[in-house]
Amino acid sequence: MSGSDTSGSVHVDEHGHGKASSSYDGAGAPAPAPAPFQGHRKAGSGSSDVPFLLRSGGSGGDGLRRCLGLIDFVLRVAAFGPTLAAAISIGTSDERLSVFTNYFQFRARFDDFPAFEFFIVANAIAAGYMVLSLPFSAATIMSSKATGVKLLLLICDTIMVGLLTAAASAAAAMVYVAHEGNLRANWVPICLQFHGFCQRTSGAVIASFLAVFVLMVLIVMAAFTMPRRTHHTAS
């Protein structure tokens, strides 16, 4: 009887030990990694997919300033063409007109008009300035906080607007006289005879005024993107 009790207790102990070990094994199994950590990693890695021009960098307006800086760069490249074309068009506008024989010739030359000479110089300076300003414009794209560079470009753009406006206005007055003449001064219009000269000078004036318009747009954009200082009043 006692032997059967002992074996029965051992049997119970074996089952109890088996249950204890199984519960211990289940409790000791390592827990899986939490799912929110993976989602946080994906959300953090998604910031690198944002385009460079739209990254805020801690300030809400930096992305907009970079986009305007890219537009500034493109407009400077676009303004280089009209200024260079205007200078070349006036410089190559000379025309000869033969009357009856080759011994009687009339010439229309740009250097006979001081306004056209000033026009060529001003547009050549503006074309060179557009090329030299491209690295500074690229610097404003890379760093939206380049306040000194933006201020320098704003001042130089304003000077170029004044220079080109004066040159284009003076040349436009000469082109008008060439087309219409002046009856009070007994100046006859010459465009009826010198068609090529008048076409080139008229096109050059239009191109120069187009460059003036582009520069004015650049000035407005620079004033808009210029950072403003905020004054905090002590309470």
Swiss-Prot record:
Sections of the chain in a coiled coil: none
Segments in the Extracellular topological domain: 89-115, 172-203
One term under GO cellular component: plasma membrane
Membrane topology note: Multi-pass membrane protein
Matches recorded under InterPro entries: CASP/CASPL, CASP_dom, CASPL
Transmembrane segments: 68-88, 116-136, 151-171, 204-224
Pfam annotation, one family: CASP_dom
GO biological process: cell wall organization
Top-level taxon of the source organism: Eukaryota
Ranges for region Disordered: 1-46
Subcellular localization, as worded in the UniProt entry: Cell membrane
Purpose of the protein: Regulates membrane-cell wall junctions and localized cell wall deposition. Required for establishment of the Casparian strip membrane domain (CSD) and the subsequent formation of Casparian strips, a cell wall modification of the root endodermis that determines an apoplastic barrier between the intraorganismal apoplasm and the extraorganismal apoplasm and prevents lateral diffusion.
Protein name: Casparian strip membrane protein 2
Organism (species): Oryza sativa subsp. indica
Origin organism lineage: Eukaryota, Viridiplantae, Streptophyta, Embryophyta, Tracheophyta
